[in-house]
């Protein structure tokens, strides 16, 4: 069993595994008509209904013009709708359409099925080790206090 405690060695071992896992999960989107980046944007819009384009761009760390292009493509595909605010007609928010929700569900379902199929190959002890690693891995993604 691996007992790496040095942070650099552990990072060097984990990084290529995460990249390969990400690559496999991206492949599961084939045939859905959506990229992993588009799925991520749809998820953010779904969890922040009526988010503005500028706020979404800031959230994702890209320029507003670049985000506008991404949203134009999602809108053309029928996955996102721009909705005028009832309170302030100048403000336009973004919402995921029914087709967008369906494609997100399909993406999640395909990715989860792929992972579950891989997990079934592991022994009970190996699955327990993966389960034990979930919380520490989540801590790696936690925002650092300002």
Regions found by a protein language model. Give the residues of each.
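N-terminal leader segment of winged-helix/HTH proteins
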Residues: 1-36, 141
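Amphipathic alpha-helical interaction segments
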Residues: 13-16, 36, 40, 129-132, ...
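N-terminal helix-turn-helix DNA-binding core of bacterial DNA-binding proteins
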Residues: 23-66, 77-79
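Helical hydrophobic small-molecule/effector-binding pocket
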Residues: 28-31, 101-106, 139
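Charged, amphipathic alpha-helical coiled-coil/dimerization segments
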Residues: 50, 72-135
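Short, charged, intrinsically disordered terminal tails
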Residues: 139-146
């Amino acid at each position: 069993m691996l007992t790496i405690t040095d942070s650099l060695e552990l990072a060097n071992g984990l990084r290529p595994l995460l990249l390969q896992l990400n690559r496999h999960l991206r492949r599961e989107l084939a045939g859905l008509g959506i990229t992993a980046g588009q799925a991520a944007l749809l998820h953010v819009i779904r969890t922040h209904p009526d988010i503005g384009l500028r706020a979404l761009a800031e959230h994702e760390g890209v320029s507003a013009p670049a985000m506008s292009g991404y949203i134009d493509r999602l809108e053309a595909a029928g996955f996102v709708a721009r909705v005028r605010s009832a309170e302030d007609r100048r403000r336009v928010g973004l919402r995921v359409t029914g087709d967008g929700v369906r494609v997100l569900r399909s993406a999640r379902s395909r990715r989860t099925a792929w992972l579950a199929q891989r997990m079934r190959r592991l022994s009970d002890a190996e699955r327990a080790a993966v389960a034990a690693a979930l919380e520490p891995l989540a801590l790696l993604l936690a925002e650092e206090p300002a």
